[in-house]
């Protein structure tokens, strides 16, 4: 079987700081494989283990409602296609990926400051894709979870709208009630509200990360190791 031995050079960035040079090469099955070339810093993203796993974890899981169709529609189901289309951007942090010879900077791609694609936001929520042209990037490709959700940029900030199960829709109510308890225990907890979006009950919360503050999940901090309550405290 003939296969291409070409390789594409990429750079893992943190805003405008180059962190890692790496390359992608296709194997005999035309599957992309990623290889580290040179780190420019002793620091690593929290939870970083292997490059391939790190990049895969930046992509929305296929089990998230409506997302697999979106990934396929825009050529993001392939790991390298995901990098080229989305730059592995996320609203969790300020890491991103560019091709080594691309004249891009953080200001060009930041999800915190640039417009979102409304078409993709709506498709991520209800599964209806009305256009195939990706004119602007979207945080939907890098948002995990199970139920349908989407990000909306409003006058007062960026908000996450989350729906629930198709039959009972109790999950938004559960999140709203849990937030009331959380605010009693911790006044700095993220506030949740309820509402309707595209005729569905949703929970709504503001984005709590920024270009200065990121989100690191406990699974990344502890790298999957079990911890007891006393150890956590």
PLM feature segments, named:
Residues 1-233:
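Phosphate/dinucleotide-binding and metal-coordinating scaffold of catalytic cores
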């Amino acid at each position: 079987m003939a296969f291409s031995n070409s390789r594409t050079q990429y750079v893992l960035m943190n805003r405008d700081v180059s962190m890692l040079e790496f390359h992608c090469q296709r194997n005999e099955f035309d599957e992309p494989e990623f290889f580290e070339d040179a780190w420019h810093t002793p620091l690593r993203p929290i939870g970083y283990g292997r490059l391939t796993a790190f990049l895969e974890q930046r992509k929305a899981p296929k089990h998230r409602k409506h997302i697999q169709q979106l990934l396929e529609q825009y050529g993001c189901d392939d790991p390298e296609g995901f990098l080229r289309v989305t730059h592995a951007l996320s609203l969790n942090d300020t890491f991103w990926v560019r091709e080594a010879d691309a004249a891009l900077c953080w200001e060009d791609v930041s999800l915190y400051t640039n417009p979102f694609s409304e078409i993709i936001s709506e498709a991520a929520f209800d599964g209806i894709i009305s256009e195939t042209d990706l004119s602007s990037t979207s945080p939907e490709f890098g948002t995990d979870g199970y139920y349908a959700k989407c990000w909306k940029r409003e006058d007062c900030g960026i908000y996450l709208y989350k729906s629930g199960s198709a039959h009972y829709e109790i999950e938004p109510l559960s999140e709203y009630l849990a937030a009331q308890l959380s605010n009693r225990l911790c006044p700095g907890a993220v506030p949740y509200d309820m509402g309707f979006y595209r005729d569905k009950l949703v929970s709504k919360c503001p984005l709590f990360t920024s270009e200065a503050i990121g989100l690191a999940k406990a699974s990344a901090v502890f790298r999957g190791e079990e911890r007891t309550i006393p150890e956590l405290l």
